A protein has these predicted regions:
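Catalytic domains of carbohydrate-active enzymes, especially glycoside hydrolases
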Residues: 5-32, 147-152
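Extracytoplasmic/secreted proteins, especially bacterial periplasmic and envelope-associated proteins
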Residues: 5-9, 51-55, 132-143
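Hydrophobic faces of well-ordered beta-strands that scaffold small-molecule active sites
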Residues: 22-24, 67-71, 153-156
Length: 182
């Protein structure tokens, strides 16, 4: 989903193999493989004016293919280096990132964990307990449904990182506010 040629090959493969539906990832690591008002474009897309999803949909539909989009929901970043997009949520909304500790979040320290494959660290997640996170995600979903002729919306990583997470300071404060006796 980074250039016309790769999309054309994908559609051709689907047609040759008699697919009737395709599922394409449009949000991987807090970035977009489409033009978005809320999500920075993936740095893998070299032509900044290219909208992969807008290119894909009419070509796929012309071949009788239904197009479903797949989004990594709470997983925000899984590389050991910071994203280059200055408007990426890691840079603009650090307070939305979930944590497994009540200590201040050390993003670079967390990203270094991704270099160690055996520790189970998948990456940085948005906090499901932070209401602004969910408002943002709903805007992203709505944008896709309203702006693109898609046939389905598939949500992946719609969970906490693991059972030790959920310690985003805002989430804890909000929990305490509504559960003062616990």
């Amino acid at each position: 989903m980074v250039a016309e040629e790769s999309i054309d090959r994908m559609i051709e493969y689907a047609v040759i193999n008699r697919f009737n539906n395709i599922v394409v990832q449009v949000r991987g690591r807090g970035d977009a493989f489409y033009n978005s008002a809320f999500v920075p474009k993936s740095s893998l897309i070299k032509n900044v004016d290219f909208d992969p999803l807008a290119y894909l949909i009419p070509k796929a539909k012309q071949k009788g293919l239904k197009v479903h989009v797949w989004l990594n929901t709470y997983l925000l970043w899984s590389s050991s280096v910071m994203p280059i997009q200055k408007d990426h949520l890691i840079h603009t909304r650090k307070d939305w990132i979930d944590s497994n500790t009540t200590s201040p979040l050390n993003i670079m320290g967390e990203l270094k964990k991704s270099r160690i494959k055996s520790n189970g660290f998948e990456g940085l997640y948005l906090s499901p307990g932070h209401p602004n996170v969910n408002k943002h995600l709903l805007k992203v979903f709505k944008e896709l449904v309203e702006n693109y002729d898609i046939d389905g919306l598939h949500l992946d990583y719609i969970r906490f990182h693991d059972s030790g997470y959920g310690k985003n300071p805002y989430s804890i404060a909000n929990y305490r506010k509504f559960n003062a006796s616990t």
